[in-house]
């Protein structure tokens, strides 16, 4: 059995799809379906069972026998970069992850988890080393602190621990994310409502490393198969502008002209204007598959999104 926490979320459900595509279906999904709309991410997937996050955490803390576990993909977290309840964030992202990590270490279960490029903050180099890490928000801090915790354990660990610093992930199964959904998702919605797509002032200068969620799932499955441990950037190694995303969406729809809107005051000083994954460690680990460009990934995503709308 493989356990996927956050399995009804965007990355978790895409990992399940990738597992299904290999013929694997013995999957336990852990999530919180208080937001019932997330069920839609699981409808076309084959899983063995579902358990609520709180019940699962209780099982983990109690050390319950959950059966034979081949691996845990830990994608469940509060991923809102605008959430400032630090106690909630640390309980949900840090303590929960520690409890799960120790459960896996005690049983030598491979543990693959979601970190984030938010650990880097406003730096201009994105290398998986302490001197490049300075998160801008409590979400980024919660991810950074768990990475630090993992670094202390890695040298002595007798089973796989692998963290992925996801950059700007976009693609299928993110419709439940609201304001945290990708720019491509929002621009598509604006065009479908008969509006012009909107970008913040300065978007031609903001560059991010946008990675297609199918590529993220492929990275996760490759590392499980390889057994490699460590903390790795999960991006394309290319920084592309928000304008490039908008151009790809407009190109798909063949209509709409980009409008600029004022940059929100609440994001000033807390916004990553530039991200670009350094892939040196990822490639050195042996992962050599190519990553979709924005033009390629957004085109595929738009076809999926408008087919399922």
From Swiss-Prot:
One of its GO terms (biological process) is carbohydrate metabolic process. The active site is at 139 (proton acceptor), 177 (proton acceptor). Keywords: Carbohydrate metabolism, Isomerase, NADP. Binds 1 NADP(+) per subunit. It holds the Pfam family Epimerase. It is an enzyme of class 5 (isomerase). It catalyses: ADP-D-glycero-beta-D-manno-heptose = ADP-L-glycero-beta-D-manno-heptose. InterPro entries: Epimerase_deHydtase, Heptose_epim, NAD(P)-bd_dom_sf. Pathway: Nucleotide-sugar biosynthesis; ADP-L-glycero-beta-D-manno-heptose biosynthesis; ADP-L-glycero-beta-D-manno-heptose from D-glycero-beta-D-manno-heptose 7-phosphate: step 4/4. Substrate binds at residues 168, 179, 186, 200-203, 208, 271. Homopentamer. Catalyzes the interconversion between ADP-D-glycero-beta-D-manno-heptose and ADP-L-glycero-beta-D-manno-heptose via an epimerization at carbon 6 of the heptose. Contains a large N-terminal NADP-binding domain, and a smaller C-terminal substrate-binding domain. This is ADP-L-glycero-D-manno-heptose-6-epimerase. It comes from Serratia proteamaculans (strain 568). The gene is hldD.
């Amino acid at each position: 059995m493989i356990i996927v926490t956050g399995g009804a979320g965007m990355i978790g459900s895409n990992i399940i799809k990738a597992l299904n595509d290999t013929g694997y279906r013995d999957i336990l999904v852990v999530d919180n379906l208080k937001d019932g709309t997330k069920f839609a991410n699981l409808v076309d997937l084959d899983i063995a069972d579902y358990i609520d996050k709180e019940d699962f955490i209780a099982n983990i803390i109690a050390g319950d026998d959950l059966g034979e576990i081949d691996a845990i993909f830990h994608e469940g977290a509060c991923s809102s970069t605008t959430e400032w309840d630090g106690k909630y964030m640390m309980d949900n992202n840090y303590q929960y992850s520690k409890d799960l990590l120790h459960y896996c270490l005690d049983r030598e279960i491979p543990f693959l988890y979601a970190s984030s490029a938010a650990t880097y903050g406003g730096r201009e180099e994105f290398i998986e080393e302490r001197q490049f890490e300075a998160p801008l928000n409590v979400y980024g801090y919660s991810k950074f602190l768990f990475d630090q915790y993992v670094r202390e354990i890695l040298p002595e660990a007798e089973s796989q621990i692998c963290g992925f610093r996801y950059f700007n992930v976009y693609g299928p199964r993110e419709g439940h994310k609201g304001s945290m959904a990708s720019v491509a998702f929002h621009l598509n919605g604006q065009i479908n409502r008969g509006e012009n797509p909107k970008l913040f002032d300065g978007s031609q200068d903001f560059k991010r490393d946008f990675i297609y969620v199918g590529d993220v799932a492929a990275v996760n499955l490759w590392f499980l198969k390889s057994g490699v441990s460590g903390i790795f950037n999960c991006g394309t190694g290319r920084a592309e502008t928000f304008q490039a995303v908008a151009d790809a969406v407009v190109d798909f729809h063949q209509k709409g002209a980009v409008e600029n809107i004022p940059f929100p005051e609440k994001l000033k000083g807390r916004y990553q204007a530039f991200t670009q994954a350094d892939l040196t460690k990822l490639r050195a680990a042996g992962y050599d598959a190519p990553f979709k460009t924005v033009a390629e990934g957004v085109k595929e995503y738009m076809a999926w999104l408008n087919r399922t709308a």
